[in-house]
Amino acid sequence: PTEPINSGNGMINNDFLTNTYVDANLRSNHIDAGVRFEYMQQPMPGFEPNFRGWGVPYGYVKYHDKKLEATAGTFYEQFGSGFILRTYEERSLGIDNSLLGAKVVLKPIEGVQLKALSGVQRTYWRWEKNIIYGADLEIGLEQFIKRMKEHNTYLTLGASWVHKHEKEELIMVDATHKLNLPAGVNAMDFRARLQTGGLNILAAYAVKGQDPNYDNKYIYKQGNVAMLSASYSQKGLSALIQAKRSDNMTFCSQRKVHGTAAY
């Protein structure tokens, strides 16, 4: 552009606007490593003001074999349907809420997978001081019930736990009263998925403790979400029906955060 434009984060008078990503990755039989350089000093129109910047916010080293995967550095993860933990990158929306820390994935026997992680979350160009801990367990019952496998039926049970520990901060409700904020908040997720032939059914439920935050206007109330999804597909035909109910289930690593990149 040759004329000043409103990019969504203020008027910009630059001849060159860019969101640039440069990835470098090395892979071997058991060890992977990678880094990513990002340049958004003059970002494309439509991105939030805090999106502007440049640097190397992403880097990792990973060891993996048939039963173990261990990652140190930055990584993305999702437990179940993502009700209590979902970190991901969506460049077209300006979202990258990766975790900086460590993650371990264990597969001790066929049909069992256990994940454990700890880290701090990225928000725009900074790493928050609040710490996230999490664990996830999935069991494929068809690996232990021979008749299920013989009839092409698969049943996966899953459970997740996430804890966020936030630093103490002062939030006033008026000139003389402050909020008594919890230092830690726990959340749990339970789910079951049944697949047989072209039928796929998923039921999931998650609950979290009292979590006063910007999104719920700092109320003291537990949150919960439930979802039931059913789909069927065969050649020339597919159908999907889904029901979901959510109550006070915003769950962010920092209580005062808002904006697109927070989610």
Predicted feature locations:
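Signature for the C-terminal beta-barrel architecture of outer-membrane proteins
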Residues: 3-17, 26-27, 31-33, 37-53, ...
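Acidic, small-polar-rich N-terminal luminal/periplasmic segments of exported/outer-membrane proteins
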Residues: 40, 54, 58, 75-81, ...
